[in-house]
């Protein structure tokens, strides 16, 4: 480890870590995806790897500036929202083309929105726009004018379009024709995604130079975070979008100038029980997982402060619920701190009919309370958290078997076979606004993980959340919306469908060979301004072989 640290340090010294670098155009940026992209179709994206590709390739009508958190014109030069907040009118840039040369027009906006809102598409992005019964109407009075009318008012309507990558209605390349700074030029499953500079990208810098500066971006698929850090130290990668605390401390010790802490993030680590009625689980397990008192007791038995201190080295805060305290406006500050109370947890379980005998918890039928907790292999922090949760729950007589799976296998169990008891993963928040979480909170949503794709709400509290989420989306003022979303957060705190654990600090690694980075808490934290990133003058511009 010492030799590795010295090699890492000497590399940064050699490339001038202590001197401000000047950028040059061209070259290939290298960093990693931590899983296989599930899709390159932007309307179907619901995983982090696919989202990263979408962000780098997709052209949107409106872009949320991740640094200022203000909306900026993109493919639309301007827009107006009607007083009833049902209609948004976009004035589009003229003479733009997709990456394959296909002209861009209002027809493409209409095509994208209709596909997004088609129930047969099952678009997670489309869920954010579902505010009421009825169909979408899109008019295109001119090639540079698109008028979109929704069946019910939507608050924060313009912010939602940051997630809508416009597809071509006519390109033979379908979703592979894009309007963003890069396009997918090569993909080798299990190895890499190669993005090439889009020669038709519309944006220019202040001096009138065409963007992006980079020729290409190579996204290596690397689930092992230690290997990723080693490659960064070797100079094979120029950034790591998220470091765990141990890696951050290791790198900070060797070369603090290569580390960045953007502050407490918006994302949460959480786990949930499988409550799907079609899951191939025993009936007694289904009964436990459906029981509110069981979920509450499990939450109370977990020592979140220890998770923050031991797993994250203090670079994390205990999580209150679905909204990070860093999201100042939407966070419900009336929520109580997560309590660590194993004695209270055991008392609650006993009141719910469980028995504690010889340090073993049993249900009323004599079944030992035992379940499997799955998480993704190669993520050291989640593996450590799983073991600590295992130890905490053993104190109340619950036996937890930790099962680590490669990410494709984990996703297969979560979304297709439903062969799991409980799962520990992270929730990535792409925006500050609660409308971006529609696919999580609507009972019909694909990311309503504990019981997804419900035809009707399975519980009265889920029905209330459905109602509140739709009402807040059409409320007249942000204050009205906040009252309703505060109530959603309160219900979630009471029912514990997700057991929120911690909010991590946003920890990153940025090579001095990369110029123009400005890390933020909003995803994607390190490369939100990818079109203006440059390699430092003197850096080898050739592609990595």
Q: What do these predicted ranges mean?
A:
Residues 8-17:
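Bacterial N-terminal signal peptides
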Residues 24, 91, 125-171, 186-188:
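Surface-exposed binding/hinge segments that line
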Residues 32-83, 114, 177:
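N-terminal lobe/hinge region of extracytoplasmic solute-binding protein
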Residues 19-23:
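Sec/Tat signal peptide C-region and signal peptidase I cleavage site
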Residues 1-9:
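Bacterial N-terminal signal peptides that target proteins for export
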Residues 67, 93-124, 138-139, 172-173, ...:
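Extracytoplasmic/periplasmic ligand-capture domains
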């Amino acid at each position: 480890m010492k030799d590795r640290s010295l090699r890492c340090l000497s590399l940064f010294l050699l490339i001038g870590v202590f001197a401000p670098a000047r950028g040059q155009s061209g070259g290939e940026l290298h960093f990693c995806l931590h899983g296989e992209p599930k899709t390159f179709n932007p309307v179907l994206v619901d995983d982090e790897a696919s989202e990263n590709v979408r962000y780098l390739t997709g052209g949107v009508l409106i872009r949320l500036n991740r640094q200022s958190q203000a909306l900026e014109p993109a493919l639309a030069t301007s827009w107006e929202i009607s007083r009833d907040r049902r209609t948004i009118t976009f004035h589009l840039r003229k003479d733009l083309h997709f990456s394959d040369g296909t002209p861009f027009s209002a027809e493409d906006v209409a095509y994208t929105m209709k596909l997004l809102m088609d129930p047969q598409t099952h678009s997670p992005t489309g869920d954010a726009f579902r505010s009421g019964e009825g169909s979408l109407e899109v008019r295109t009075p001119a090639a540079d004018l698109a008028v979109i009318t929704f069946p019910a008012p939507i608050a924060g309507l313009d912010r939602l379009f940051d997630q809508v990558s416009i597809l071509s209605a006519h390109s033979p390349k379908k979703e592979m024709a894009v309007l963003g700074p890069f396009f997918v030029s090569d993909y080798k499953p299990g190895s890499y995604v190669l993005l090439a500079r889009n020669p038709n990208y519309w944006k220019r810098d202040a001096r009138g130079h065409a963007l992006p500066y980079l020729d290409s971006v190579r996204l290596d698929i690397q689930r092992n975070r230690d290997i990723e850090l080693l490659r960064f130290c070797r100079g094979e990668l120029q950034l790591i979008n998220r470091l765990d605390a141990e890696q951050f401390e290791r790198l900070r010790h060797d070369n603090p100038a290569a580390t960045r802490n953007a502050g407490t993030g918006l994302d949460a680590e959480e786990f949930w029980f499988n409550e799907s009625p079609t899951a191939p689980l025993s009936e007694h397990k289904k009964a436990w997982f459906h029981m509110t008192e069981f979920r509450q007791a499990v939450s109370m038995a977990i020592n979140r402060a220890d998770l923050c201190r031991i797993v994250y080295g203090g670079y994390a805060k205990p999580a209150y619920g679905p909204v990070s305290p860093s999201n100042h406006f939407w966070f419900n500050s009336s929520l109580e701190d997560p309590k660590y109370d194993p004695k209270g947890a055991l008392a609650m379980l006993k009141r719910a009919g469980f028995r504690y005998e010889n340090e073993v918890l049993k249900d009323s039928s004599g079944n030992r309370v035992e379940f499997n907790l799955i998480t993704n292999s190669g993520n050291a922090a989640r593996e450590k958290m799983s073991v600590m949760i295992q130890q905490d729950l053993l104190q109340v007589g619950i036996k937890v078997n930790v099962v680590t799976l490669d990410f494709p296998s984990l996703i297969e169990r979560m979304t297709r076979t439903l062969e799991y008891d409980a799962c520990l993963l992270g929730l990535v928040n792409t925006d500050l606004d609660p409308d971006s979480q529609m696919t999580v909170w609507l009972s019909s949503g694909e990311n309503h993980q504990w019981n997804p794709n419900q035809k009707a709400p399975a519980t009265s509290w889920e029905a209330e959340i459905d109602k509140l989420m739709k009402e807040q989306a059409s409320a007249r003022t942000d204050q009205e919306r906040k009252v309703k979303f505060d109530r959603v957060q309160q219900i979630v705190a009471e029912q514990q469908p997700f057991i929120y654990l911690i909010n991590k600090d946003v920890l990153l690694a940025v090579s001095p060979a990369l110029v123009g980075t400005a890390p933020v808490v909003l995803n994607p934290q390190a490369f939100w301004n990818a079109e203006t990133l440059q390699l430092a003058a003197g850096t080898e511009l050739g592609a990595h072989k």
